[in-house]
Amino acid sequence: MELMTVLLPLAALVSGVLFTWLLMKGRFQGEFAGLNAHLAEKAARCDFVEQAHGKTVSELAVLDGKYRHLQDENYALGNRFSAAEKQIAHLQEKEAESARLKQSYIELQEKAQGLAVENERLATQLGQERKAFADQYALERQIRQRIETDLEESRQTVRDVQNDLSDVGNRFAAAEKQIAHLQEKEAEAERLRQSHTELQEKAQGLAVENERLATQIEQERLASEEKLSLLGEARKSLSDQFQNLANTILEEKSRRFTEQNREQLHQVLNPLNERIHGFGELVKQTYDKESRERLTLENELKRLQGLNAQLHSEAKALTNALTGTQNKVQGNWGEMILETVLENSGLQKGREYVVQAASVRKEEDGGTRRLQPDVLVNLPDNKQIVIDSKVSLTAYVRYTQAADADTAARELAAHVASIRAHMKGLSLKDYTDLEGVNTLDFVFMFIPVEPAYLLALQNDAGLFQECFDKRIMLVGPSTLLATLRTVANIWRNEQQNQNALAIADEGGKLYDKFVGFVQTLESVGKGIDQAQSSFQTAFKQLAEGRGNLVGRAEKLRLLGVKAGKQLQRDLVERSNETTALSESLEYAAEDEAV
């Protein structure tokens, strides 16, 4: 029996592992290595923060222990003083010194209170330091988020600049028709390249700033730890000083008491009577106070008794509702527990799982049957997991309340039979043939009460195999939560893979766009060179060489052509110089020919 108790939970665990293997077979083998490294880095950072937090908590616990030890010493000192008072009651001749001892005790109490106030102040300061450390950690996260936001804005700016560069390419294409604006377009392209360079420098500066802030936060954390250490040492020093002061005062008072007790005996009797009378009044006041407090406690106990009765009645009503004949109430409760497990798994409702999704299944006679599983959990590659909640509480509750072994065995058999009946009913629904739903080979039958689930598996070794043969996976809250978290992890990996593909696609498009821009820019350069060559040829025809247009036009003006404007002097002089040079070269050539 003990072996079965061990093997059945192990079988449930093996079933969970088997399902996980069915889900993850052939997928994500390469991606898990990178994910595990990333998670390890995150876990290392979390461990570092948790270690720092644990160290601070342990130091606070040590300080609290020292403070309690100080209170115990104070209490022990009070006990010693009480013993001294009893001794004074038996020795009237020592009453005078008793008064001084009481005065000393009062002073010690005042000092103890002062130390307690100081300890509270130190504890408050420690709490503030701890809060400051938490605020610094939160500030670090905010700074990192802000830096990531700035980097994303920088990337967006770079993309905008790249789009602007593409526009520049179009402008250069239009520049072939507008040669007069070529130089302005080239300056604009240079300005955009400088802007791109400045953005890259800004991104590098943000990265350096991030490293500086991380270093600053680490330094502040070390400073906080040093402050905590100094506060602990100060508290220990104060505790030692208080103990030494108490011992010194007690020794001094004891010595003075031995020297002066006989001389002041006659001054003690009257104050002693007054103190005894005051003590009686104090006892009376204490008794009255205890009576009032006892009455208050009695009223509070009556109120608690009423609340207990109310809770008992409400618990009984809930038990009756869940174990009665109202199966709808049990079903609603089971669905509520199932949805709670889904919310804690990390899956998002409406996207990664759907509640009460209606579907249709075709029957063998050609008709259709409408089915509505409790939950459909979506998987990558358009697959789904069907989860149906089944509540078996009536027999289980009677089993827990059984007064003898025979009744317990009978109710246990009824409990297992109830689960088996739910399993057979679920297998008849055959959720695997639903239209529009690509389910796995298994349907999850969820039992919301973990002890009831484990009790059935422990006492019926064939129940799990019988469910498995009918393609039903019997799960409780713990096993279902582990499976759903595995599904959530699969979705995260799928999202990362989709993001990686999108990044690769965008990178390819960006590279193609960059190649096109380079080709366009080369064409623009060739056009600029060609335009420059054409410009030089046209300018030579205009103002250089023999018979140029400027020289001919200037001759017409000199011959008396009326004109309201004149050509620029330097252009005319250049035309004359080139004309004279051309003529001299022609004469030289003729002389050589002669």
UniProtKB/Swiss-Prot annotation:
Pfam family, one: RmuC
Record bears the keyword Plastid: no
Keyword tags: Coiled coil, DNA recombination
GO terms for biological process, alphabetical: DNA recombination
Coiled-coil parts of chain: 66-330
Cysteine disulfide partners in this protein: none
Top-rank lineage group of the source organism: Bacteria
Job of this protein: Involved in DNA recombination.
PANTHER family xrefs: DNA RECOMBINATION PROTEIN RMUC
Family according to the record: Belongs to the RmuC family.
Protein name: DNA recombination protein RmuC homolog
Organism: Neisseria meningitidis serogroup B (strain ATCC BAA-335 / MC58)
